[in-house]
């Protein structure tokens, strides 16, 4: 850490170990299954978030009816995996109605072009509390030549591309994906997929409007190495960063398993806040978040127009921060937030207004934050979440300043199961309660 951080006074400090990266290990679990490589036993001993636990269990399941919980990632990646590999009929289901509305139809259509036998059930009414999502039948994805798929305009999820890329080396002739749009949604996550595949020995090439994947197999030794030392989740690290930036008293948070330099696209949260990773690094795998330094830094910043098309999951947290700091800003590239675990656009507007802030949303211009001081609020302030984990976590720090009534606080289990434990640990050391 830079010497400018050093101070003679004692600052309350806590250490946090974040859950393993969802973006890395959801992909690596599927790659390991395709390579017929056992997942190291340590993964079965970890307290995983729901997203990773679903993919870990379901990707190796021999059951005919498999629940993907509330995980859109698992739903899409497993759909492609089973379309290629299953030797039995598989039905993916979910106990969550919202999952029937999440993006999947585009992936099904593209897999069908490759010869897969799969379809969404005609009725998506629940059976014994489970909503049917997609039925997959065994077939052989044999092609006479190199298949070329053209992605539909208005792609709803980058995971459609990731799902196809992950299985592409195991198609007889590989795969070409083409697209017409100038920019794919969450392109940084597609780049992550390509980087992991290349690290595991796959030959692929990318140009402005397409990706070619040669037939091949994932390197088992590389997969074993990548799966042997779990790396912390940058999409979870945004929340301790937010705590440091909103904490009512000085503190330091040590994130013990998050490298500053990471393939994870969510690490770009630092760039969006104009924070250099060099300011935070104490070792290869530890970040130190100093609240006094970070708060001073953010108070001095101005924000104009930002594109979050590559980092949509950071939008709720960033908006909450900018509202708290009364920053005027425009945030673009977020139309697909309506298709997430909730309609995040509607909930961000609702919760921001409940907390007394002025903000609007237009399709062309995105979110516009007025940058004004909040009006007075009536407590307890209701925070609507629709069981969306990111809606719970993004607004929780306001409980230092208002009595909040947060819906479904347990939704954090989906991605950051120790969220409340870690936040309350911070509350103890700074001797400030949460008003929840």
Regions from the language model: what does each represent?
Residues 1-436:
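Short, structured segments at the rim of ligand-binding sites
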């Amino acid at each position: 850490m830079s010497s400018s951080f050093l101070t003679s006074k004692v600052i309350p400090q806590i250490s946090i170990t974040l859950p393993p990266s969802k973006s890395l290990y959801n992909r690596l679990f599927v790659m390991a299954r395709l390579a017929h490589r056992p997942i190291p036993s340590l993964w079965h001993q970890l307290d995983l978030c729901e997203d990773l636990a679903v993919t870990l269990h379901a990707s190796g399941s021999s059951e005919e009816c498999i629940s993907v919980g509330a995980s859109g990632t698992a739903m899409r990646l497993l759909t492609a995996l089973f379309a290629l590999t299953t030797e039995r009929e598989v039905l993916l289901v979910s106990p969550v109605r919202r999952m029937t509305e999440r993006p999947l139809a585009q992936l099904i259509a593209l897999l069908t072009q490759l010869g897969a036998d799969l379809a969404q059930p005609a009725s998506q009414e629940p059976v014994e509390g489970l909503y049917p999502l997609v039925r997959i039948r065994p077939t052989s994805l044999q092609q006479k030549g190199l298949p070329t798929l053209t992605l539909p305009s208005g792609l709803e999820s980058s995971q459609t591309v990731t799902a196809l890329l992950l299985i592409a080396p195991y198609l007889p002739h590989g795969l070409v994906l083409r697209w017409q749009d100038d920019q794919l949604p969450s392109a940084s996550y597609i780049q992550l997929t390509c980087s992991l595949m290349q690290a595991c020995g796959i030959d692929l090439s990318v140009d402005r409007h397409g990706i070619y994947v040669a037939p091949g197999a994932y390197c088992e030794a590389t997969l074993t190495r990548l799966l042997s030392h779990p790396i912390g989740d940058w999409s979870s690290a945004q929340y301790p960063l937010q705590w440091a930036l909103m904490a009512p008293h000085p503190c330091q948070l040590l994130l013990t398993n998050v490298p500053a330099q990471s393939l994870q696209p969510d690490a770009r949260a630092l760039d969006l806040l104009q924070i250099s990773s060099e300011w935070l690094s104490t070792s290869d795998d530890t970040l130190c978040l100093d609240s006094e330094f970070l708060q001073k830094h953010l108070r001095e910043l101005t924000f104009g127009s930002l594109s979050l098309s590559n980092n949509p999951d950071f939008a709720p947290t960033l908006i909450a921060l900018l509202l708290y700091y009364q920053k005027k800003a425009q945030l673009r590239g977020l139309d697909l937030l309506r298709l997430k675990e909730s309609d995040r656009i509607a909930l961000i507007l609702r919760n921001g207004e409940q907390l007394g802030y002025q903000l609007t949303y237009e399709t062309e211009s995105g979110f516009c934050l007025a940058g004004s001081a909040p009006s007075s609020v009536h407590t307890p302030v209701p925070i609507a979440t629709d069981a969306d984990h990111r809606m719970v976590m993004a607004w929780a720090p306001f409980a230092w300043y208002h009595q909040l009534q947060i819906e479904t606080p347990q939704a954090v289990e989906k991605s950051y199961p120790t969220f409340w434990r870690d936040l309350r640990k911070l509350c103890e050391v700074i001797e400030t309660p949460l008003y929840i």
